[in-house]
């Protein structure tokens, strides 16, 4: 995760950062990349990444493009105790302001790696679950730890190259009367992580 270096706030706040400064709302809005900053802005040192390991759950993100989805998935991982995310190199940047904002601080507690996925997962002897429209209904899956959960691109799903490594295709059943085409990838992640 990340370690706080400086916290700027338009209100009094407790901080574990080395430095804390109270600033005006106007000053905060001038330095923030967001139209409506929430009153706090943090500056973090990016620590050297530890080595990715597969001793517990790892979430793999295959080509996600929406920074809000990435930030939400980081927050979900934090909520459900998943500490590592492996992103394909074409996944949106984790430090995109919208991704950072959507993570709501969870980015400081989750390790996010950007590397080629296949070299990491080929030859692993653990379950690799992938989200598909035509998979086994999630409520029928007996998830085993450690394991990998692959979530695909918003428009195209999991790439054909990664699909070959999936040992269990999983799906989230819709209500019979539903006319929705699919779930947003972050919404799907919430359902899968809960199971």
Model-derived segments and spans:
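Arg/Lys-rich RNA-binding interfaces used to dock onto structured RNA substrates
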Residues: 1-66
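RNA substrate-binding interface of SAM-dependent RNA methyltransferases
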Residues: 1-2, 51-135
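Short, acidic/turn-prone active-site loops that include or flank metal/cofactor-
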Residues: 12, 25-28, 90-92, 117, ...
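Short, polar loop motifs at secondary-structure junctions
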Residues: 8-14, 47, 116-117, 133-135, ...
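Structured adenosyl-cofactor binding patch, chiefly the S-adenosyl-L-methionine
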Residues: 76-80, 91-108, 160-195
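Active-site/ligand-binding-proximal alpha/beta "capping" segment
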Residues: 129-180
């Amino acid at each position: 995760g990340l370690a706080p270096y400086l916290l700027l706030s338009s209100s009094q706040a407790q901080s574990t950062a080395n430095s804390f400064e109270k600033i005006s709302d106007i000053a905060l809005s001038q330095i923030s990349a967001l139209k409506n900053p929430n009153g706090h802005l943090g500056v973090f040192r990016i620590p050297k990444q530890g080595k990715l390991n597969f001793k517990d759950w790892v979430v793999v993100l295959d080509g996600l493009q929406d920074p809000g989805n990435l930030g939400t998935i980081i927050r979900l991982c934090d909520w459900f105790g998943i500490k590592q995310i492996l992103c394909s190199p074409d996944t949106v940047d984790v430090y995109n302001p919208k991704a950072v904002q959507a993570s709501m601080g969870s980015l400081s507690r989750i390790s996010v790696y950007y590397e080629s996925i296949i070299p990491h997962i080929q030859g692993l002897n653990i379950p690799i679950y992938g989200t598909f429209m035509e998979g086994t209904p999630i409520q029928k899956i007996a998830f085993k730890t450690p394991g990998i959960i692959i979530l695909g691109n918003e428009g195209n799903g999991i790439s054909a190259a990664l699909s070959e490594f999936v040992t269990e295709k999983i799906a989230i059943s819709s209500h019979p009367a539903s006319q929705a085409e699919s779930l947003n990838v972050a919404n799907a992640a919430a359902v899968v992580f809960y199971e």
